[in-house]
Amino acid sequence: MPQKEYYNRATWESGVASMMQNSHSGVNQLGGVFVNGRPLPDSTRQKIVELAHSGARPCDISRILQVSNGCVSKILGRYYETGSIRPRAIGGSKPRVATPEVVGKIAQYKRECPSIFAWEIRDRLLSEGVCTNDNIPSVSSINRVLRNLASEKQQMGADGMYEKLRMLNGQTGTWGTRPGWYPGTSVPGQPNQDGCQQSDGGGENTNSISSNGEDSDETQMRLQLKRKLQRNRTSFTQEQIEALEKEFERTHYPDVFARERLAAKIDLPEARIQVWFSNRRAKWRREEKLRNQRRQASNSSSHIPISSSFSTSVYQPIPQPTTPVSFTSGSMLGRSDTALTNTYSALPPMPSFTMANNLPMQPSQTSSYSCMLPTSPSVNGRSYDTYTPPHMQAHMNSQSMAASGTTSTGLISPGVSVPVQVPGSEPDMSQYWPRLQ
């Protein structure tokens, strides 16, 4: 199998190489060959126009002829505008189509009907014989001329206000002493030298075609095709919208059978239904993004603040001593090192925790404080019962240790216990601490 695939790939590459040698320089994504920098042949252009006349969409024409969609759209757009399928000249400058005469007619049409569209002006230029299919300006060129007219009127200032009123009243005359928009611009109010009569209907005479033989018939057919292919926005009824929304709730990506069934049900073309679902999915993605943003904002605002204090319900409360205990670690350890002399005053009560699982904490035991001894190979951290100095015994509670001295067990580590003798009246700890050290 790998050898067969390699053979097929080698055959395809050799075929492409042979095509490139025969004046072809590339293969597009659809599998069609083209010559880079050169226009399509006239036969392919004629097929594109014929398929468009038969009702095929540009995307279908692109797949049928294996020509890129942009190329098909560009050729059809130029054909609708000029009626020509010939490519434009390669290199050089284009001839100027916005001549002073054409600019004057455009200004005249704009004065007669301020709401006229650029494509209507273009049709009037063709119908009145001002331009031909070869030198007719495009819609973008007409819009550019209209923008220049508007900017020129804004720059007139106070002196131009009177001229604007004259234009609105339809009075003939010049545009004041200012020069035209282009050098040598003809006066808009003067009649055309070609003898073309001015139409009084404004934009209503856009479909009137001058009878010039075969060119007139061809132009009329082309304009009708252009009006047919340039559709308006589809208006959906409430029943159609409900059916589409119901299908969208079922699935966001209906197959061709579902679209055809829905098209027969609500009397809409399948292509319109496909476009509606594409737009509806885009709208749903925008709404979903907003919902996620709101959900994140609500979650961040409803977070519970973290408390730095421990819950008191976990540990058993320990009774606090009535008198603050004050002692020095140096006196307890029997050492005179100044670095270890730290005064503890008013220490909070801390429970004594053990690692023994079977030894519960007795509530009657007194609180203990954890003292960290110096690091040694055998001693790490130990917990001792509360040491009460002799001068503090009178202020202790009756539940504290008796003065005669009681024996308790101080747990050092898991499984190890050391008996601790708490002296009652002797301040000397020499008999006690050496045992631990």
Curated annotation (Swiss-Prot):
Protein name: Paired box protein Pax-6
Gene3D superfamilies named among the record's database cross-references: Homeodomain-like, Winged helix-like DNA-binding domain superfamily/Winged helix DNA-binding domain
Chain residues forming the annotated DNA-binding region: 23-149, 229-288
Keyword Lipid biosynthesis: no
GO molecular function terms attached to this record: DNA-binding transcription factor activity, RNA polymerase II-specific; RNA polymerase II cis-regulatory region sequence-specific DNA binding; sequence-specific DNA binding
InterPro entries: HD (IPR001356), Homeobox_CS (IPR017970), Homeodomain-like_sf (IPR009057), PAIRED_DNA-bd_dom (IPR043182), Paired_dom (IPR001523), PAX_fam (IPR043565), WH-like_DNA-bd_sf (IPR036388)
Family stated for the protein in its record: Belongs to the paired homeobox family.
Start and end residues of each stretch annotated as RED subdomain: 101-149
Functional description taken from the UniProt entry: Transcription factor expressed in spatially restricted regions of the neural tube during embryonic development.
The keyword Calcium appears for this protein: no
Tissue specificity as recorded in UniProt: Spatially restricted regions of the neural tube.
Localization (cell): Nucleus
A GO cellular-component term linked to this record: nucleus
Pfam families in alphabetical order: Homeodomain, PAX
Bias (Polar residues) ranges: 187-213
Organism: Danio rerio
GO biological process, one term: hindbrain development
